[in-house]
Every structure is written in C-alpha cells, then in structure tokens.
Amino acid sequence: MRKTKIICTIGPASAGEEILTKMCQSGMNVVRLNFSHGTHEEHLEKIKMIKKVREKLGYPLPIMLDTKGPEYRIRGFKNRKETLQDGQTFTFTTRDVSGDATIVSVNYAALVSELKVGDRILVNNGLLIFEVRELTETDIVCDVIAGGEISDHKSMNFPGHVFKGDFLSEADKSDLLFGIENDIDFVAASFVSNKENVSELRNFLDENGGEDIDIIAKIENRSGVDNIDEICEIADGVMVARGDLGVEIPFIEVPAIQKYLIKKCRLLGKRVITATEMLESMIHNPRPTRAEISDVANAVYDGSSAIMLSGESAAGKYPVEAVRNMAEIAEYTEKNIDYVKRFYRTDYVIKNNLDALSHATCAMAIDTKAKGIVISSISGMTVRMVSRFRCPVDIVGMTTSQKAWRKLNLSWGVTPVMSDEFDSVDVMFYHASRHAMDILELKSGDNIILTGGQASKQSGSTNTIRLETIR
C-alpha cells in the first residue's frame, strides 16, 4: 500500500470525467485547482466534475484551492512581446502605458515606494534580470542584466523583499468565498512569509464559514523559510513550492531547503508537500527522465507527506501516465526505506498527551509486528498525529465526518474510512477491527492496534490504545 500521497493539478488536459476517473484509479489522492488561471465559472465546472467522479467511485477525493497570492506582474505590450538586450535601459512604470522595448506598466501601484537603487527585479521566473538604477514618482529605471524575450503579463519577483500591505487581495477574498461556497477542503496560500499572513487567512476563513478548511502554507521566499516555526503554529501544512522559491533565492539552495522544510514539518506534525517540475518532461513525453525519477524518489526518501503534479496533469499530453509513474516511483522507493530504524532514531517533539499517545501507538504497532493501526477520530487529528511518525504499519483512519474523511486522504500512510457513530468504545473497536480485516486483508493470528476515545462523539477525546489479535 503506497503511503506517500499524490496531488494533481486539474486543467484542460484532465478536466473530463473519464480522465479524472482514470487518474483516481492510477493513484491520485487530492485535486488542486490553480486560481492563478481561469474564471469562477470554469472552476465551478471542474468542481462539479470532481464531485461527480468521487461520488461515482465512493472515493474521498478532496479539493485544494491554490490562491493567486500577492502576485506582481507586468502589463501588456503593443506587439505582445519584445526582445531586450543586455546592458540597455528599461523602465517599469505605475503609469498606464502601452509597452514597447523601453517601457512597460506594472500591476502594483505602490511598487516604486517599496524599492531602492541597486535592487534586482526578475521577470518570467528569473529568465530576465534587471537592476534598479533610478527611481522617480512613477518610474523604476533599470539596467538590463540578462535580456531576452519579454511578453504580456509575465510574473515579477523581487528577491529579498516582503512588501507591505494586506496579505489577501480582493481577488483572493473573492476566490476564497467561492471556495467556501463550493465546499473545498484545503487552501494552498501562495507566498506566505510569516505567521501574520496565515493568521489573516485563518481569520477570513473562520469569519465566512470556512472553519473546517485546512491551510497549506506555500513557502516561496526567504522569509517563509526563516519563519517556518511560527508559520507552522497556525498552518495545517506546508508546500515546498520550488518554482518561485528557486527564483526568490539562489536555486542551488533549493535542495537543502527542501530537506530542511520536510524534516521540520515532520518533527512538528505538519503535512508537507513537495511540488514543482517533478515530472516536467511528461508534459510532452510519455516517460520521465532519469533525473525526474530521482527527484520524486528523493522527495519520498525525505519524508514528504505528498508529492505534486502541476503542468504534467493540468496541460500535459499524458496526465494519467504521469500519475501512474509517480505512484510507481513512490511505492518502490518506500519499499527501500527502513521506517522502523528511522522511527527509533528520530527525536520527535512530544508536546502533549495526544503526541505521546500517537507515538506510543506507533511503537506498539512496531514492537508487536502489527499488520495495521485503526484509529477512530471525529476530526481526524489523532490520525494525522499518528501519521506524522511515519510508522511502517498501514493506518486506517475512521471518521464520521465527510470533510475529515476527504482531508485524511492527504495524510501519509492513511486509508480513510467513513463510519457510523458508536455509543461505547467496545462497539467502536469491534467495528474498527471489522474494517481492518476487509481493508488490510488480515488473517487469523494477525495483530492490530486500535486507538480511539471513550466518548466517540466528542472531538479530542482520544485516550485509548488496544492490542487485538484476529481470531
């Protein structure tokens, strides 16, 4: 049973019912909708299709809304694109102009006040580099350090800068309200820099009926890396968004930062996603490169909760094959990891009773050579806490909540199961063992670990571990 989960971005190549069904059957666990592209009407059609497929399959397929975030972009050119030469002068302006080879408008009115002479501006994911030479009230006059083709609406990055102002734009707020209305499960928040960004998002969701939506903080700049501990105090998970991260900081640092963030999240009990360009060549080719296979495998070795497909599944020629290849790479890699040794040598942070109980659950499962861990949890919190320890024993997460059932499909090593409410712990554990027998294909003599609470209708009541032997 594969433990590392797979997130797939849905786009023109994968929005149909047949393709979505095949992607689920090939290993997709979570769908991602990128709100940097498309209208609400287009996203609504995708959401309807996703819900239709998951109902047809009886599969807990959660929906992740990825926000635009504080995006900075150039506006348009007369001829849609221009070619800039190294060493020439080029101006970014807050005025409304029609762009040419010397000037282009930007979408952020306060940009001039945020920069200083000597700062660098990167355009189109760092392919073009500019250095600020002069600032006026409306213009940023630059020297072109690395030229090339520049075209309409390309992204801008400002390494080392965290701009002032509200984290959530009006466009983001509109998208979030749309997501709440359509029962999305996760929000992937772009360009999170600090705790305050996550707090602003959490408050907005809570005030508008999105209390049960989990926040995944996308780490895409130096501030996000530096502030990871405080970000994890509020965020429910982290995405290592290597695309913009490799533009905002020197790209040679990205592998080390990836490992650092994954380890940090595992120790703190947060879900962590490795994303961007994992099987990039499969946008055009039916098989991944050897380097891409190694990249996916290393993300699994590092302990990622999930790995993600972007353009490969949204706009590529081979979305189903990309999912299947990623699943096969992950499953084979997991077979070559000694999770028992890793469990005992890792110095986990144990902050409370639930942490201690979850750690003990894993230790008991390993020591008794159990074939499975079955956890009954209203909110899914206990299941996620057991998952954080990366126990080699398969985990079945039982819940009475549809939302928790779906969200558990992002947790490492967990098979989510919908269950009824039970009046006693004995009845709950009886049904838990029945579920385990079906899902884990247990036989007489197999041990399983059962974890739950005496008051099954009350979230946060987990206080019991039981060892059962199948008769």
Predicted regions and their residues:
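Non-catalytic helical/linker scaffolds that mediate oligomerization, partner binding
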Residues: M1-R471
